Every structure is written in C-alpha cells, then in structure tokens.
Amino acid sequence: MNQRTVEILDTTLRDGVQAAGVIFSLEDKLKLVRALDKLGVSYIEAGNPFSNPKDAELFRFAREKLHLKNARLAAFGMTRRGGMRAEDDAGLRALLESGAHIACIVGKASISQARDVVGVAPEENLAMIEDTARFLTENGMSVFFDAEHFFDGYREDPAYALSTLEAAARGGATRLALCDTNGGTLPSAIHEVVHKVAARFSVPVAIHCHNDAGLATAGTLAAVEAGAMQVQGTINGYGERCGNANLCEVLPDLELKMGLRALPEGNLSLLCDTARFISELANLNMDESMPYVGRNAFAHKGGMHIDGVLKRRDSFEHIDPKLVGNRRRLLISEVAGRSALLTRLKKVAPELTRESEATIRI
C-alpha cells in the first residue's frame, strides 16, 4: 500500500513575519526560501507583492534567478474589494504580475466578519470570493483559498461558512484551507468539521491553525486524521500573537508518529539545522526546550534516567534524536549519578569502568 503524502505549505515569510520582533531583510528572505526548499516543503508562501515592496522584489528575483528543487512559491493576497470588478483590483493585478503560479487568497468565512469587519453584505462576500478565484484561475494561476475564521464562522452559521467554500470551488480554487484564525478551537471540533468538509468537497482540504490556546499542533494533526491533505504552518511556530502551527513539531509528528510522508525521504534529519538557521535569520533566541529540535529535547540530568537511557534508548526518549538532526545530551550535575559521569569520562579515558578507582574517587 502506498504511503499517504501530506502537502506542507510553509508560511514563515507571510504569517511568521507577523510575530513580534521578527524582521527579515530581502537577503534573509532569499536565504530562508533556499533553506525551506532544501528541507523539502511543498509550497512556500513568500509574502504579499501588493502591500510589501520587499515581497514584490522577492518575487521579481525569484522569477529571474531563483531555481528551486522541491518547493513552489505562492503569493498571498486578498479577495477583490467590495463593489469592484476583479480585473480592476490592484491587489489582484499585483498577484498576476508577481510571476508566482499559485495565489493564496484570504476571504471571510464568517457571516459576522463579512458584515461587521469587511463591511459588505453576506452575498457580496460570496461574490468577492468566487470572482477572485475565477479571475486568477482564468489568468493562469492556481488558487488556494484561505477561509479565514472558518471554525468560528462554522459555529456561528454552518451553512454560510460552507457557502464560502462552495464559492471558492465554483471559481476554480484547488485547495480549501480551513483557518482556526483565533486559535481557540479544540482538536475534537476541528476533527469533526474537517471530516464533514472533506466528505462534501472534491477539492482537497488544508488546515491552518494558530496557537492561542496551545492547540495548534494538536488541531493540525486532528485535521489530517480527518482528511486534510495540506498542512500550513511556520518554522519554530513564528506568527502573530501566540504563533502558528509549529512545523518543527508537526513534521516529525506526521512522519514518525502517523506514518505519513511530509518531506522527501531522509530530509526530516535536516529539521534541527533548519530551525536553528531560521532563528538566526530572525535574530531570535531558539527555544531550547522546543520538542524535537531544542537542545534540551533529548537532554538527561537525573542519574536513574541517564542510566536507563544508556541501557535502552526508549527508556526516556520517544524517538532517536538523529531522525530530526538532534543529539542526546547527558548533563553533569549533583543528581546525575555515576553513569553520566562515566560516559563523559570515557570520552577522554576509554579504559575506565564503573569499578575503576578513579571513577569511584571522582
């Protein structure tokens, strides 16, 4: 039986830059794109060419000089404005001129958000979504529709939330991304809704979670279990407020826990180096207790734990750290015990044993 593959859309350059303190120069962005391509993600959402001149320059450079092996660049934009034809919308024109073959378009999936925030009638919001998807599709772009506030909108008015997806699909969208924009939806609710949407639509479903309730990774995995075939997230979980789904957690969970293919074979071992490289580009300290990629993820301090993990790795390690490019650390402390000390000593004196006089004396 063939291994199920999950698409990965990295949005570090779009959603990630909304995190407090994260600023990338154009050179940084190009380095980040190359690092993500080397890691092997499917898509890189590289920014908004209409609202950010730096992003427009990135797409110009990519069009002329950037040759990617694994990833495809996507440009981010909004639906057409209310009361305007799609062909007259400057933001949509910028997407076409970016040279990107994929447009990630965000539109409101909540009836109250459409009415109270965008200021348009619910019917006009649906027309904006459909017109935008159709215009871009007819001009040669693939459209990924980001249904903003989808889970909140579904709780509020399920029929209307689903109608926004129907509008996108009628316009030719090739992915329907369900967004937990406020980051407060429980994984069980995400599973239930994604299952219903995936069963209803022939267009593949994607999941886009924020971490405001500490549930972004769990919600993402629940969505994949329910039928989502694309995951959207950021390296190190960078994103506005509390961040986005952290691909440094999601990627190994998908591959090592769920048995799915998310990256080219063997590329998961690049994850730790990629996470550190991007944290350096962002000028942010790495969270050393981050699962999988932090220096402390496989650090052992207690004497009994060190003794146990040296005898059997799975005593206190849920995976081999090498699978994600990390390594085990045995910490010397007042609670470390003889096993930790001996392991460190044997690096310089291989002949020592637990019973050696020098070991006992130390």
Could you say what each language-model-derived stretch is?
Residues 1-2, 165, 192-199, 221-224, ...:
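Metal-centered catalytic cores of metalloenzymes
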Residues 3-8, 15-44, 51, 61-68, ...:
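Alpha/beta enzyme core
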Residues 5-6, 12, 252, 258-362:
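A mid-to-C-terminal "edge-of-domain" accessory segment
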Residues 22, 48-52, 81, 122, ...:
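Hydrophobic alpha-helical scaffolding
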Residues 69-76:
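A glycine-rich helix N-cap at a beta->alpha junction
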Residues 205-212, 219, 233:
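Histidine-centered catalytic micro-motifs
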Residues 215-231, 238-253, 296-320:
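Flexible glycine/proline-rich, aromatic-decorated loop/lid segments
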